[in-house]
């Protein structure tokens, strides 16, 4: 049985789009077979006394907490440790860190060499910002493990982030003990990389999945990228059904997070109906 989650930000968007209250949209999600939400840590920390009871009343849990940090430059890990403590207190076993960014020139150099693992590894080992991230993530992974939490990176859709492409991600997984991977199906298109190959190469590290799809554009003719437009999960050009089947064949039993920012929740097929049709 697939476990479905949805981003809490989508819940808030659906309220704006439909005029319904947050509890009403949460109840709708539960009726559609969704059992959890993806939660931004800062939002939860600022509204915990409101959000936690609403989720409990709806029969929903938090599948993963996510937050942006600057481990490439900031050595203070206090806020990240607070996030891990909060996740543990809510029985959240996965957190996603957007862990930092490079300067534009550094990012361009990494992009130029990221087609091979050997060149990628040389760059990553010599870059100070990336080494700062490694030290921070290593410390936090150890801190998290003591609390029953796994920290993850995703294939981020940004040029400056050194975890946007396949080989840099593999390098991080191999150099940070305990680090795990959140597969975002839609984000390799940003770097014009093959999501199927990436999922295969990184399969042993995958503990969480974002089901983000992409809409085709007649103006985009990349090798793997045919557009970056938003579209409800399962309706775009990415091989989502096959990827999910392959994950299940590898005994993946984690959450599948529905991610489709700016797509109308109430005018799209339900997650349950979409699963039946694929």
What does each model-identified segment do?
Residues 13-17, 38-50, 69-77, 103, ...:
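Acidic-and-aromatic substrate-binding clefts and catalytic sites of carbohydrate-active enzymes
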Residues 1-94, 128, 180, 278:
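N-terminal pre-domain/capping segments
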Residues 37, 139-237:
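Acidic/histidine-rich catalytic cores of soluble enzymes
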Residues 34, 92, 206, 252-253:
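A structural motif
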Residues 57, 61, 72-181:
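Active-site acidic/histidine proton-transfer and metal-coordination neighborhood
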Residues 266-275:
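Conserved small/polar residues in nucleotide/adenosyl-binding loops
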Residues 29, 55, 87, 151, ...:
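Conserved, mostly hydrophobic/aromatic
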């Amino acid at each position: 049985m697939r476990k479905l989650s949805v981003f809490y930000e989508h819940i808030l968007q659906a309220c704006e789009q439909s005029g319904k209250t947050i509890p009403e949209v949460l109840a709708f999600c539960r009726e559609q077979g969704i059992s959890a939400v993806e939660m931004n840590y800062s939002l939860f920390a600022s509204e915990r006394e409101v959000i936690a009871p609403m989720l409990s009343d709806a029969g929903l849990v938090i599948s993963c907490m996510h937050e942006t940090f600057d481990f490439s430059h900031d050595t203070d890990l206090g806020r990240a440790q607070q996030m891990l403590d909060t996740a543990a207190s809510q029985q959240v076993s996965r957190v996603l860190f957007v862990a930092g960014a490079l300067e534009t020139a550094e990012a361009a150099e990494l992009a130029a060499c990221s087609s091979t693992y050997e060149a990628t590894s040389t760059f990553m080992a010599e870059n100070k910002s990336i080494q700062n991230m490694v030290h921070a993530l290593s410390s936090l992974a150890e801190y998290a493990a003591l609390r029953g939490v796994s920290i993850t990176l995703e294939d981020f859709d940004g040029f400056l982030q050194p975890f946007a492409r396949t080989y840099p991600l593999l390098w991080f997984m191999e150099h940070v003990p305990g680090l795990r991977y959140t597969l975002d199906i839609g984000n390799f298109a940003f770097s014009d990389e093959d999501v199927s190959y990436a999922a295969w190469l990184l399969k042993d590290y995958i503990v969480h999945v974002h089901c983000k799809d992409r809409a085709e554009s007649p103006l985009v003719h990349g090798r793997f990228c045919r557009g970056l437009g938003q579209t409800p999960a399962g309706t775009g050009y990415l091989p989502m059904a096959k990827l999910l089947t392959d994950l299940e064949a590898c005994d993946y039993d984690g959450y599948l997070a529905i991610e489709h920012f700016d797509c109308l929740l109430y005018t799209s097929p339900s997650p349950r109906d979409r699963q039946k049709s694929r």
